[in-house]
Each structure stands twice: as C-alpha cells, then as structure tokens.
C-alpha cells in the first residue's frame, strides 16, 4: 500500500511539472517599413549602451544605417521617407537561428533603456501630404528551414536550421532626364548599359588530416577579366584637352648585362648597311630597336602581397581621379579627362566607382614585395613577331627586326671583309653561337672565322638543306640545316656556324652566305626547343643567357600578339586564408587573366554569411553609392571604426564589390542607390554578451529635385509600423525534458525498496 501511494504521488508530480512547463513561442525575423510624407525633416532616434540619441535630417535623399550586434536598421529618404528594420541573429555552431528583437530574455538579453523600442523614428512635417499609394520595390528574400532533434543525456533538443539567401545585385530601368543640370560635358543618358566583366567561380571541397584533426578545405578557382568595355555616351559639348595625349607607344625591354645600340628598322626588300668589324669581347652594333613587351618571369614570392590599381582612360572632358593603393595607404591624382574613376579599399573590400562618357578600363595588378629569378631548366621567353631579338650574356648583343640579326657572346670574332659576299634578303634571319662563335652582319660582306673553324663540320657533323624548315642542333655532333626561306646557324660549346677544329670550307675572299627571309631558328644545348613563326627572328645563347636557359627552356613566338608577363602572389589573410594567385597579362589586348586561385579555409571558420557563434557577433559594414540627376555621387564607406564620405561628378555609376570570392557589379543610371552589406565575424568576451554593441552608423545627405525609386536590399515590405510582421520562423532551441522517462525512473527506484 505504501509503494502504491508513492507511485501515485510520483505520477501526480510528473503531471504537474508537465503542466507548468510551457514551450516558448518561436522567434521571428521581421521587417517594418515606414513612409514619411513629402520633403521635410525626419528625426531618427538611435539607442545603444544604455542611452538614446536623436538626430534630424533634411529629407531629399538621406541614407542612414545602424548596426546593433547583429541588428541592422536602414533608413532611406527619397522624399517620401522609407524606414526599414531588419533583425537577424545567426550562429555557426549546431544550428543557424534567426531571432527578432522581441526575443525572450533567456535567449537573447541585453539592457534596454526606458523609452526605447516604442518607435525608431519620429517624423515632423511642415505640411500635410498624402502617403504614397504604391509600395517600394524590393529584392526577394528566400529562406529554407529544416527541423530535427538531438539527445543529450535525458534531454531532447529540437533544432531548426534556417538558411537565408539574399539577392546581392539589383538592376533598374533607365530613368530619362528631361533636363540636364548644368553639365555641358554630359548629354542625355542613353539606354545602352556598359558591359561588365564576366566572373566565373568554381569550388571543390575536401578534407585533410593532421594528427587527430580533420580539416575541411575549399578550393575555389576565380577567373576574371580586368578590362571593361562600354558604348560611348554622346557628349553635346567637348572641351579640348591638349594636356592628355593618346599614348600608343610602349617601353622596350633591354637586354640585361649588355649594351644595345639601335637604329630604325629597314623595310622588307631593301638591304641594310652596317659596319661588319667588331672588337672581340665587345658589344656588337645592330639595326633595330629591341622587342617591346618582353616577358618577365618571377619565382616564388614572399607571403606579403601588394595590390595596386592602374586606370586607363579615354580623354575628352571633365576630370579623372586615379587612386593607387599600396599596402596601407592610398594616393590620388587628378587628370583632365572625361572619365572619373574612384577606387576605395576598406577592410579588405575593394569598391570601384566608374563614371564615364566615353570609356574606362581598369587593371588590378597584384605583385609581391620580393621576387626571385627563375632557375635554369624552367625559364621561358616569348618574343614578338615582326621584330627580331637577340639576348647574349656578357658584353655583346644585337637585334635586327625586319632584317637580319647577329649575336656574338664572349670572345666572338669580327667578320673579315674582302672579296667575300653576303646576300641577305630582308625578312628575319639570325645567327647565335655561344663561346667563341661568330655572326654575320646583313647588308655587308662578312666571313665567319672563329679560331680555325668555319662552315664545315669534321667528324660526325653534317650539313642539310631543307626548304621551309628550321634547324635544330645538339651538342657533340653539331648539325647545320640551311632552310630556303629561313637561315640559321647554331652550335653549342665553342662552335660557330661550324664545329671548331681544323677543317674550314669558307675562307675570306671566296666565301658567300645566302640568307632568304622567312623564319630563323636558334637552338640551345640539352633538351631545349625553339618554336618560331615566319616574320620574326630570335636568337638565344646557352650558358648565362638571360633570355633562355639550357635544359628544358623554350622560346615561343606568336604572330600578331605582343608578349605577356606572369607573376605569382602568395598571401595569408587575417582569418587564416592562404591564397596563391598567378596572373598573366597580355600587352596587346590589355587584358589581365587570373589563373585558378586556391583558397584553403580552415574548418574553424564558417562560410555562410552572416554567421556568428555563441561567443561571436556579426559586424556589418556598408559601401553605398548614390547618383543624383547626372551631377554628383556621394560615396560613404563605413567600417567598425567610423565612416568616410567623398563626392565626385557623375552621370553613370558602376560599383564592383568583391566579398568572399563573389563579385557583385552595380550599375546606376541617374538617381538610384544600391547598398552592399559586408559581413565579418568578431569574437566577443563573455562579459560583453549582454551588452548592446554599437558598430557603425552611416549617414549620407543630399537633395534631389525628382522622385526616385527606392531600393532597399535584403528587406521585405510592410506599411504597418508595428514590429509584429513575421516572414518566417526560426528555431527557439527549445529544451523539452522527457518527463515520462523521469517519472518512470523514479517509480522504478521506489519499487526497489
């Protein structure tokens, strides 16, 4: 009887506990939109850290953003005022939870002063006007949630995982301008939108182990084209700008370790006269200029990286501001033109503003502080056709584009004029011989007499004549191939056009060399290969040559395009990201192509945005661009330590924002405002969790005479000023004890007695 009474008592206690415990209602995320009538004054009240502050703004165009520890409030005034309130709290741990400001104290608590929370804005008007009847267009917001449970001891925890996806880029139709505001250089805007570079990103995930840790990695390949194209915007009035000329020339590359004396190149079909004799061991004299745009190869770089910006513009009217950023500082200069480019770098986010009325092309150059030269066996040289190049270490070098070239390294011998004749048809021929080699000079008589060797090869050497093909020689048994349409003479070691020895078939007074235009070839010992196209000659010398290195080096010449350059950059980000970037630049096309970028992401960092853990908070910064009636753009950049604002003349605004390998391009045509939120995660100390952190406030004041569409990213719309509009539900992380199990457990213990 006693045991039965105790069992009944335990059941009553369990029932009472089940009735007392109530599951709290789920938290929500909501947006509240408030409209202010006409153009007047708006008073915004912001509360943080136990106090409230009030600030008044003259409505015309006003942008105000406030971030409170994961809570973003956005105010946009266009003449009506639009106020948007968004509350998001997310975590990167077991679940991603979204809460509203009306969260329960046991979930999200912070001190709130009296008088706050009634309303976030107070509107004062000087005249009574009607509220707009049409709703403001906003981007769509999609949310997906999955529910589940997990157990810990005798507790059952219900979880809800929600993923919030927002539309990052927005577009608007062209707003025609009936009257241009005192801007004679910019006519009415056309409906042609500027072309933007294409961005393609592919990512692959994987894991790697280190001791007992499993690290998740994500490798992303980003390909970008730096130059942009757009159709020209017609100008009604062009101001002459004599200070800005069209620069079409290029800086030629010089040969390291040698002096080059050049004269203008000759045209095909004519002969070139030059002094045949040169002193042994001295630099030779050649007839053209050096090859512009020669390649630059760098090896491994240090972990520190430098990003610079180079802007190429077309000249017409107005002013261009070019900003070059290097490390932690930026410098600006102003040039008279018709294009304005503003580049802003804020906490790792690069924002580019381009206003044009004709065309702007911007190149982003990533270089390293210290570079090392390439080692033999892996070097490569690309030469530009139409001009010949010859690189010879030591003190001699000669290049002859459009004609013949001769390179004589080391102790090369001088040609001996006399009765010998040289027939050289313009085109491109070359002769390169290392060691004590000799070379012929086109347009004059010359004979090759290095040592006692000349145009024949004793032993196993052979001479072949094959039309239309280039020669290739290997050390040891030299081979000379004479092509009709291309001439070449290459021998490694101490041979020149022939292998040194005692045999000679060409002596001064009787020797003759015939060279026809086409393509010349040069060879280096080992396994090196040379590819050359018609119309250009190249010469490479093994040994300490700076152009090519023996081993597996190669020389390629492509017609119609200039040479390019490649460089490597390795950087380590602030959150443990290690990035390796290899960039190749094409001089002719003006484009910069970035090869796949590998990004290793440690597993301790979350890839979802926004994210925050139990000891983390979301820090949001904004980059806002506003264009007002083809006149002025005001750019405000905000980080967690403050905001900076500057203005510039504009009519068209192009904003490019790159965040976590996602590039977003915004194009505005007259009075559109676009805001991009940049999220970062910051650790918080435990004692700060219950405090309200005021992160950043952005204010942008301007006036406009014409109504404009309101663009509010990431928000939904409601004309109700109350804070009870719910768009979707998040997880309450409710903890429901299994009371039945506890009661059964107690009953079993009682029956044991």
UniProtKB/Swiss-Prot annotation:
Family annotation (Pfam families): Flocculin_t3
Induction summary: Expression in regulated by NRG1 and TUP1.
Location(s) in or outside the cell: Secreted, Cell wall; Membrane
Keyword terms, alphabetized: Cell adhesion, Cell wall, Glycoprotein, GPI-anchor, Lipoprotein, Membrane, Repeat, Secreted, Signal, Virulence
Post-translational modification: The GPI-anchor is attached to the protein in the endoplasmic reticulum and serves to target the protein to the cell surface. There, the glucosamine-inositol phospholipid moiety is cleaved off and the GPI-modified mannoprotein is covalently attached via its lipidless GPI glycan remnant to the 1,6-beta-glucan of the outer cell wall layer.
Residues making up the signal peptide according to the UniProt record: 1-18
Residue spans of the Sequence repeats: 253-260, 265-272, 289-296, 373-380, 381-389, 390-397, 398-405, 406-413, 414-421, 422-430, 431-438, 439-446, 447-454, 455-462, 463-471, 472-479, 489-496, 497-504, 505-512, 513-521, 522-529, 539-546, 547-554, 555-563
Positions in coiled-coil regions: none
Any GO BP: cell adhesion
Low complexity composition-biased segments: 241-260, 367-554
Topology of the protein relative to the lipid bilayer: Lipid-anchor; GPI-anchor
Region (Disordered): 241-302, 367-565
InterPro entries registered for this protein in UniProt: Flocculin_t3_rpt, GPI-anchor_Adhesion_Reg
GO CC terms of this entry: extracellular region; fungal-type cell wall; side of membrane
Listed Polar residues bias regions: 261-302, 555-565
Propeptide: 731-753
Glycosylation sites: 702, 719
Residues linked to a lipid group, GPI-anchor amidated glycine type: 730
Family per record: Belongs to the PGA18 family.
Described purpose of this protein according to its UniProt entry: Cell wall protein which mediates cell-cell and cell-substrate adhesion. Required for biofilm formation and plays a role in virulence.
Protein name (record): Probable GPI-anchored adhesin-like protein PGA18
Organism: Candida albicans (strain SC5314 / ATCC MYA-2876) (Yeast)
Biological classification of the source: Eukaryota, Fungi, Dikarya, Ascomycota, Saccharomycotina
């Amino acid at each position: 009887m006693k045991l039965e009474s105790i069992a009944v008592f335990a059941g009553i206690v369990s029932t009472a506990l089940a009735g007392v415990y109530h599951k709290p209602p789920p938290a929500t995320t909501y947006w509240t939109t408030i409209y202010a009538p006409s153009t007047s004054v708006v008073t915004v009240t912001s509360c943080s850290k136990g106090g409230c502050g009030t600030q008044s703004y003259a409505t015309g165009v006003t942008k105000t953003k406030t971030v409170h520890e994961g809570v973003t409030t956005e105010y946009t005034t266009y003449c009506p005022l639009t106020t948007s309130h968004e509350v998001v709290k997310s975590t990167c741990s077991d679940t991603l939870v979204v809460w509203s400001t009306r969260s329960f104290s046991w979930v999200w608590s912070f001190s709130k002063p009296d008088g706050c929370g009634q309303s976030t804005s107070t509107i004062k008007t000087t005249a009574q006007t009607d509220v707009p009847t049409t709703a403001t267009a906003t981007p769509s917001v999609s949310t997906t949630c999955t529910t589940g449970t997990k157990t810990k001891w005798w507790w059952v925890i219900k979880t809800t995982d929600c993923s919030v996806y927002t539309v990052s880029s927005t577009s608007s139709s062209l707003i025609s301008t009936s009257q241009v505001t005192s801007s004679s250089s910019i006519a009415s805007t056309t409906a042609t939108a500027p072309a933007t570079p294409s961005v393609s990103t592919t990512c692959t995930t994987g894991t790697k182990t280190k001791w007992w840790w499993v690290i998740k990695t994500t490798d992303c390949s980003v390909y970008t084209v730096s130059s942009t194209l757009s159709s020209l915007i017609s100008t009604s009035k062009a101001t002459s700008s004599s200070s800005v000329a069209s620069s079409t020339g290029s800086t030629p590359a010089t040969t390291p370790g040698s002096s080059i004396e050049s004269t203008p190149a000759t045209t095909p079909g004519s002969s070139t006269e030059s002094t045949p004799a040169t002193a042994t061991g001295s630099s030779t004299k050649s007839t053209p200029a050096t090859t512009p745009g020669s390649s630059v190869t760098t090896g491994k770089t240090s972990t520190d990286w430098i990003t610079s910006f180079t802007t190429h513009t077309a000249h017409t009217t107005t002013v261009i501001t070019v900003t070059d950023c290097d490390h932690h500082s930026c410098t600006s200069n102003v040039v008279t033109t018709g294009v304005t480019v503003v580049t802003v770098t804020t906490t790792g986010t690069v924002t580019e503003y381009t206003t044009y009325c004709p065309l702007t092309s911007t190149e982003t150059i990533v270089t390293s502080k210290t570079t090392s030269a390439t080692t033999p066996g892996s070097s490569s040289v690309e030469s530009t056709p139409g001009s010949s190049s010859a690189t010879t270490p030591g003190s001699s070098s000669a290049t002859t584009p459009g004609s013949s070239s001769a390179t004589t390294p080391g102790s090369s011998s001088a040609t001996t004029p006399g009765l010998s004749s040289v027939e050289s048809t313009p085109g491109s021929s070359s002769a390169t011989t290392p060691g004590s080699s000799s070379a012929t000079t086109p347009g004059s008589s010359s004979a090759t007499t290095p040592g006692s060797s000349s145009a024949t090869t004793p032993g196993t050497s052979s001479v072949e004549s094959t039309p239309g093909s280039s020669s290739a020689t290997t050390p040891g048994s030299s081979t000379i191939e004479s092509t009709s349409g291309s001439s070449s003479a290459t021998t490694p070691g101490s041979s020149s056009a022939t292998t040194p020895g005692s045999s000679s078939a060409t002596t001064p007074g009787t020797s003759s060399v015939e060279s026809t235009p086409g393509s010349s070839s040069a060879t280096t010992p080992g396994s090196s290969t040379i590819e050359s196209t018609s119309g250009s000659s190249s010469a490479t010398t093994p040994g300490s040559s700076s152009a090519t290195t023996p081993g597996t080096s190669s020389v390629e010449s492509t017609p119609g395009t200039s040479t390019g350059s490649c460089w490597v950059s390795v950087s380590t980000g602030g959150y443990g990201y290690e990035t390796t970037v290899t960039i190749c630049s094409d001089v002719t096309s003006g484009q910069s192509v970035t090869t796949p970028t590998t990004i290793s992401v440690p597993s301790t960092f979350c890839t979802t945005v926004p994210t925050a853990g139990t000891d983390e908070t979301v820090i949001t910064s904004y980059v806002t661009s506003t264009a007002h009636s083809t006149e002025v753009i005001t750019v405000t950049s905000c980080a967690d330590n403050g905001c900076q604002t500057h203005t510039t003349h504009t009519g068209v605004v192009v904003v490019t924002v790159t965040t976590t390998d996602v590039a977003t391009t915004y194009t505005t045509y007259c009075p559109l405002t676009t805001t991009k939120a940049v999220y970062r995660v910051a650790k918080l100390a435990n004692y700060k969790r219950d405090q309200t952190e005021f992160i950043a406030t952005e204010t942008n004041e301007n006036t406009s005479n014409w109504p404009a569409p309101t663009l509010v990213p990431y928000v939904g719309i409601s004309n109700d000023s109350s804070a009870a509009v719910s768009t979707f539900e998040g997880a309450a992380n409710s903890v429901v004890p299994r009371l039945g199990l506890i009661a059964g457990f107690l009953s079993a213990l009682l029956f044991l007695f």
